[in-house]
Regions:
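Active-site-proximal catalytic alpha-helix in oxidoreductases
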Residues: 1-41
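NAD(P)-dependent Rossmann-like dehydrogenase/reductase catalytic/cofactor-binding core
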Residues: 34-109
Length: 109
């Protein structure tokens, strides 16, 4: 379930900025996608009270990308998922600068 959340929240939130497919996300916006995935993993760790191997989860996310490379990053639930991730991070006292940057960019457009 954690891997599924990493995939969905990362692709939806980064997709708010980049649009496109998951294969384009990784090929054109890897640094942002990796940073956001790591923030999402920290949120998942706080929610579950467990620690996770971020590199292994990101590898799992990439395997999912390979399974459906043309899958679109952003659906209509993306803004709500971003808001929920920020709320969860706030409740856990986590530093999530990339997710906050995406939210700030959404407010100015």
């Amino acid at each position: 379930l954690v891997l599924k959340n990493v995939y969905i929240v990362t692709t939806n939130c980064v997709g708010l900025v980049t649009g496109g497919s998951v294969s384009e996300l990784w090929s054109r916006h890897r640094e942002l996608a990796d940073a956001v995935a790591r923030e999402v993993i920290s949120i998942q760790a706080a929610l579950t009270g467990r620690t996770f191997d971020a590199d292994a989860l990101i590898e799992g996310m990439l395997k999912a990308f390979d399974g459906d490379p043309d899958h679109k990053c952003m659906g209509r639930s993306a803004p709500a998922r971003l808001a929920r991730a920020i709320q969860q991070a706030d409740e856990a006292g986590l530093d999530i600068p990339r997710l906050r940057g995406i939210a700030a960019a959404q407010q100015t457009t």
